[in-house]
Amino acid sequence: MLGLNSGGDVHIARLDALPVAAIIPSVTPEGYSGDIAMIVGVNFDGSVAGVRVVEHKETPGLGDKVDLRKSDWILGFNGKSLKNPEPNAWNVKKEQGEFDQFTGATITPRAVVHQIAKTLEYFNQDKQRLLNELSSAYNQLS
């Protein structure tokens, strides 16, 4: 679902030993020029804490605007969840969705939007299991 070759490492962010967010690696193969790797921070209420693209081969000046160093577009996901907007709005505006695409580049932002939605779905489906497994591992280290 998340496009990872291996299980990928999900990390839990804690505040005063209480879990507050998960940091989830996610890769979409649907970029214009290939895979787009990102990390998605998900608050335990299911909202996006933050997203960063960590690797891509998108066209300079067009699709590379998914990278925070090129554009602040990626910050538009902060605070969003599968309830805000509704799941059918997790698309680019060109396809009646909530999120902007770039002039001359729709494929790249569409791929990122869809992958973030998949990551939120994964988190919501596996939240309790992730929390239990990671809390158990954390307790063994303490």
Segments (PLM) and residue ranges:
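Flexible, solvent-exposed loop/hinge segments and secondary-structure transition points
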Residues: M1-S142
